[in-house]
Regions:
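Small/polar beta-strand repeat architecture
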Residues: 1, 89-232, 236-308, 337-339
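Beta-sheet repeat architectures centered on beta-propellers
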Residues: 1-96, 189, 194, 311, ...
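Beta-propeller and closely related beta-pinwheel folds
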Residues: 42-61, 90-95, 292-305, 337-509, ...
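Repetitive beta-strand solenoid architecture
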Residues: 54, 74, 116-118, 157, ...
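Structural hallmark of WD40 beta-propellers
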Residues: 66-69, 317, 424
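Short beta-strand segments and strand-loop junctions that repeat across beta-rich extracellular domains
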Residues: 77-81, 189-198, 328-333, 373-400, ...
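Hydrophobic or amphipathic alpha-helical targeting/insertion segments
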Residues: 88, 186, 317-331
Length: 685
């Protein structure tokens, strides 16, 4: 007797295998469509180059001439993809430019030391651009440096930078010669960590605004204070500094026991595992005392060093790019401009520190969330403060009686995590609540309403709107908002997902909409990984209240853009052990992103032609054996299975069917494998 097996679409990972009778319980690289499982589509590499860093945001748009672009921001660089090629448009931090730096070489060594005349504020891992080199020593030439990018290998002091060449020096020489050094804007760390304990990297205080001042006199590479004597350090100002505590100067931590006027007393140099170093007069000095217990295990701190993030949008045909907790850049997409770098949005009123940015439509106000209360003052950044520009302007932000610029502070939560533009409102999330921001016109311009509590989002890029409904991933569940109320979504894979998320890396969570198959996917890092390595998908087209359809996968993408501008979704995948190739940076460390066209064929295809098969599977829960006339057995029937007739729609490659049988729910299953080479293969057991 033939027995038809039909199972509900979606996975049930909340129940035991026996409790999930009639359902699927495991799957990988598979989706459910029209009620049946199928393998997901393949992907094809768009460009042979691998990008530096991990993708953090991606945006596609069309300019006024009809040209199609994709912008990709990683934790290291900003790129344009246009007609099959990448273009590096990473902005330069012009305020940090160093001219007249000198070279020092050591015979037989690849290390070259660049000495600057003033403090460079660089960190190991930064990218620098050298130019106008003259009289280069050690057997190197100007062509080895002019218009060449380098990764900073080490920072021995406030005025020295070490880089690694591709070949060794022929002689020891220097300091001599000159070179101009430009610095790529620092986007932020690769991974999210807790605390400011040494080893987590403070990024020169550039990740979060700290109380800061400058040295009033140089420090030598010794154990003494200002000028190489005593136990006092003179600062330009001590306003806001703790009465006793710790300061950070370049990469050195220094403790002090008291303050007299603008002088720190009782200093101890090179504390908590750091080394003493020379620091020039005017070097930036941070008060680290109130942010973390220095020397404590970072896992005990609730202070988060967030990973480098971007928000990419278009304003008309121009790309607007916000570095998380920093400022706004703009790139104009005229064809001759493809190799021109993004530049700061100019103006004396533009915010310099914001957590996220959106453009409201159709009224066209640029909105910054988690931004500064005093324009052009990053130290006044308030994580709960919202500010918007004058209508149709990116540079006018000061409210007046004759414009529509304005601001509003929200209250529920400790910080605003992100915002998106919805069909009828801008949606803003804190770590605990959701707000709507609607254009209402003069005199207030925007009206705010809190529409949900205890429903915060998990990361800046974890929310999307589809068909007028906002969906997002919170710290412990999935939510949706249909314009009326926030609802917690029933999910039969939630324990599997939320018990396996690396909460030290959850800022990397990225949402993806695949309208081709009615899917919303969240890519997340599992407990076993510092980077995105898994995903969970909700099928919004076929789900019902009685049967919400969810499934999980090891498909890992750090960014994703919906089809529309291009006919398929485009996505980035980060690989920590892969060497980046674009742009060419001498001495660059491993850690690169592939750029994929999704839903292309059935395999993984690299630009080199290398093809890897994608092995998808689905696994059901236990299934009772049926008795006469379809009677369910509930365990009292025994059966011998002699043949299987698969019913496949379209099959590429072989399909293996595994039967796992057991006499009792707690018995060890016995598995047998059978391979179907075509969709009409009959299997005899």
């Amino acid at each position: 007797m033939l027995h038809k097996i039909r199972l509900k679409p979606g996975l049930d990972k909340q129940s035991s295998d026996t409790g999930a009778e009639g359902k699927w319980v495991n799957a990988d690289y598979s989706r459910f469509r029209y009620g049946f499982p199928e393998k997901i589509g393949g992907w094809e590499q768009l460009v042979s180059d691998n990008l530096i860093g991990a993708g953090r945001d991606q945006h596609t748009w069309v300019d006024l001439a009809g040209n199609k672009y994709a912008a990709i921001g990683t934790n290291k660089c900003l790129y344009i993809y246009f007609e099959g090629a990448f273009y590096d448009i990473t902005p330069l931090d012009t305020a940090r430019q160093q001219t007249g730096a000198t070279f020092t070489t050591v015979s037989g060594s690849k290390t070259v030391t660049l000495t600057t005349s003033t403090a460079h504020d660089a960190e190991a891992g930064d990218i620098i651009l050298c130019s106008t080199a003259t009289s280069v020593p050690g057997g190197f030439s100007a062509s080895d440096f002019d218009d060449i990018l380098f990764e900073v290998t080490d920072v021995p002091s406030a005025t020295t930078i070490e880089i690694t060449m591709g070949s060794t020096a022929g002689s020891s020489a220097g300091p001599s010669g000159t070179v101009t050094i430009d610095f790529y804007y620092v986007i932020g760390p690769l991974i999210q960590t807790y605390g400011y304990g040494w080893g987590t990297n403070t990024w020169s205080g550039q990740t979060l605004p700290l109380i800061q001042t400058t040295l009033d006199g140089a420090l030598l590479n010794d154990t003494y204070g200002t000028g190489g004597s005593g136990t006092d350090i003179d600062l330009v100002s001590t306003t806001g500094f703790a009465s006793s505590g710790t300061i950070l100067v370049d990469s050195e931590l220094i403790t002090y026991t008291g303050i007299t006027s603008n002088t720190l007393n009782g200093i101890v140099r090179g504390t908590n595992g750091t080394s003493t170093a020379a620091h020039s007069d005017g070097a930036t000095t941070y008060d680290a005392s109130t942010y973390v217990g220095w020397g404590s295990a970072s896992s005990s701190s609730n202070i988060v060093i967030e990973p480098g993030q971007w928000r990419l949008i278009n304003y008309g045909e121009n790309l607007m790019a916000l570095i998380h907790n920093k400022t706004i850049f703009q790139w104009e997409p005229s064809l001759p401009n493809l190799s021109v770098r993004a530049v700061l949005v100019s103006g004396s009123e533009v915010p310099t520190a914001s957590r996220d940015m959106v453009l409201s439509t159709p009224d066209r106000h640029l909105i910054c969330v988690g931004t500064e209360t005093t324009l052009q003052s990053s130290t006044t950044q308030d994580d709960m403060f919202v500010r918007w520009s004058n209508q149709e302007s990116t540079t006018v932000w000061t409210p007046t009686a004759t414009n529509t610029a304005g601001s509003q502070r929200l209250t529920d939560g400790s910080k605003l995590l992100g915002a998106i533009v919805g069909r009828t409102a801008v949606y803003i999330w804190s770590d605990t609540a959701m707000y709507t921001m609607k254009f209402i016109g003069q005199p207030f311009t925007f009206g705010f309403q809190q529409v949900g509590t205890n429903c915060g989002m998990s990361s800046q890029h974890s929310a999307a709107e589809v068909n007028g409904i906002a969906y997002w991933m919170g710290p412990t569940g999935f939510y949706k908002f249909d314009g009326g109320r926030v609802q917690l979504m029933p999910c039969l894979v939630e324990d599997y997902v939320f018990e396996d998320i690396n909460t030290n890396a959850n800022q990397q969570i990225h949402v993806a909409v695949n309208a081709l198959f009615g899917e919303i996917t969240w890519f997340y890092p599992s407990n076993a990984s510092d980077y995105v390595d898994r995903s969970v998908t909700y099928n919004y087209l076929e789900s019902t209240a009685e049967n919400p359809i969810w499934y999980t996968s090891s498909l890992a993408r750090s960014t994703w853009t919906i089809e529309g501008v291009f006919n398929k979704p485009y996505a980035t995948e980060f690989k920590s052990a892969v060497a980046p190739t674009y742009p060419t940076v001498v001495g660059i460390s491993n850690g690169a992103s592939y750029y994929w066209q999704q839903e292309k064929g059935t395999d993984e295809v690299f630009a080199s032609g290398t093809t890897n098969a994608i092995a998808g599977y689905v696994e059901s829960g236990d299934y009772d054996i049926g008795g006469p006339e379809g009677e369910q057995g509930e365990g009292e029937f025994m059966m011998r299975i002699s043949r299987i007739i698969p019913d496949y729609g379209a099959q590429t490659g072989d399909s293996r069917i595994t039967l796992s049988t057991k006499a009792f729910p707690s018995s060890t299953a016995v598995a047998t494998n059978h391979t179907a080479t075509t969709s009409t293969t009959q299997l005899f057991t």
